[in-house]
Amino acid sequence: MLTDEYVKRVYAQVEKRDGDQPEFLQAVREVFESLEPVVAKHPEYEKAGVLERIVEPERVVKFRVAWTDDEGKVQVIRGYRIQFNSAIGPYKGGLRFHPSVNEGVIKFLGFEQILKNSLTSLPMGGGKGGSDFDPKGKSDAEVMRFCQAFMTELCRHIGQFTDVPAGDINVGGREIGYLFGQYKRIRDEYSGVLTGKGLEFGGSLARTEATGYGLCYYTAEAMRVLRNDSFEGKTVVISGSGNVAIFATEKAQALGAKVVTASDSNGYIYDPNGIQLDVVKDIKLGHRGRIKEYAERVPGSEYHEGCKGVWTVPCDIALPCATQNEIDEESAKALVANGCTVVCEGANMPSTPEAIAVYQSNNVLYGPAKAANAGGVAVSGLEMSQNSYRLSWTFEEVDGKLKSIMENIVANSLEAAKEYGHEGDLMLGANAAGFVKVANAMVAQGVL
């Protein structure tokens, strides 16, 4: 519940203006609830109108994308790029291609990105983009033509010192390659305008693994500091089967845990003997198949239709890595009832407010997405650095920097939580630590 008059007033304005964007309202309210002790301690933020400004994007770009499918039919859909806040660096955030994409979804993701990027301590502002294009069932040629059409419009709004997009759901190495090629062709320049590129043309080692590995580094450090515990011997439930889920599984297994689930939009698999990651990689990365194929190939494993059931599997640690609001109150209660004591988020905002309340009332160690999944954008920032210097670091160098960044996020979040009277609260601490850096920059730069 909001109690601070300044916070309540600004949230009411957001609600009135953006009432048709539920994901954005949810993200703003969660952050605002954490920021009440912060704005009470910093009256200069109200004087400078920081809250009013930070919830309003600096620029919203919405554009038509027209492309031709394999049958020669013209398809027309929408593209978006929301350049939310550049107080601490150029806009930075991924591109998502999914039928669920609309302005409200991109807006919530861009808002979260401001604080997430701030937490990495790297000089990156917040932005997000995408389209309601669905690459599933499309040929490589169709995906290429769509990416080229999308970049033809987007290219006039981005640049290595202005806005540096990356991948997100359904935008992986293939799509980034097509987007980069079209940008290079139109602008006639070879620059670090996108991250997540192939190693052959400016990409960074460990970028593919970064979000999943970073999630586990964050979780391990939070468990060590707050619970004097580790992954060793724990049973882990993970949703999703994309890059984040796959590499979270890989790192959790390396840290001594047994991961027993994976899922996609149709259902989930349960393997009591532990997920065979090589099989998942072959299905999902090798030929873009469906996760049910795992149960056909691995004796003793089970496939279940529907995604919610994954949260009924007994576990010690849950790492949601699929999509927003995948864990509701009912699912959170099922996790707690089945022994889960740690939830750290690999997806963006995968827990509803009601689910978070269940975690908090049951002493579950909860790591919010903007902190726990910041590894991807952290290594994107490191890729930008390598592009600027025209050099390439080794996998071990990048991975070491990633681990250090994630451990620092835990430390900075806990320090902020203590400073504002909520010791041990990783969610409030992440929101406060990320916000204060951006707010101070906004105050210093004047009313813009």
Please give the residue ranges for each predicted region.
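N-terminal ligand-binding/catalytic initiation module
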Residues: 1-205, 437-446
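Adenosine-phosphate binding glycine-rich loop
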Residues: 2-27, 222-223, 334-448
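Buried hydrophobic packing segments
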Residues: 106-109, 179, 215-223, 248, ...
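Short acidic, glycine/serine/threonine-rich loops at helix termini
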Residues: 142, 174-181, 205, 247-251, ...
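Glycine-rich phosphate/diphosphate-binding loop of Rossmann-like nucleotide-binding domains
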Residues: 203-312
